[in-house]
């Protein structure tokens, strides 16, 4: 296996989540139900309306008059939704980088369409977390994180994986909130890099200011 990169080794990842009830996990996972290789999240499909939708109900309950949520409102929305299940609610910092991941117009806020995309990703990441947490500890360790990242289609070197574990673990264990923060940052930075990797060969050139804009926001 070649390191590093995100080239042809990603597989065909697809998952259908829109329309699920709040807090409901993604259907059975495994080798046949995987995630999009580049982004590490399901391909989003806007196939359902807001009418009678519990996702929209929770979003609209905290959204401002502009129809968007900031990080604090997103945190409240996700906590009220119960999407974390038995895990601790998402921290404010994790909610900040969730918004940054999908903040394509740089407003520092998230509209409903972006929220639906986030909702799909969170359900998939949660199911992935539960799948690799084989001992049911509520945390993932180094070898379990390696499996989770592999299921998401990323090809990372052992050195990079070790760096990620050191950054997001507490005593060698990664809790769900930190795991999601890792997934968000991995997706966002990969998307940022991939847009500049014009030949899709795992290398890119960009200026310093562009680098700072892309990385400091996450």
Curated annotation (Swiss-Prot):
One of its GO terms (molecular function) is calcium ion binding. Ca(2+) 1 binds at residues 103, 105, 107, 109. CDD domains: EFh_PEF_grancalcin. SMART domains: EFh. One of its GO terms (cellular component) is cytoplasm. PROSITE patterns: EF_HAND_1, EF_HAND_2. It is found in: Cytoplasm; Cytoplasmic granule membrane. It holds the Pfam family EF-hand_5. Calcium-binding protein that may play a role in the adhesion of neutrophils to fibronectin. May play a role in the formation of focal adhesions. This is Grancalcin. It comes from Pongo abelii (Sumatran orangutan).
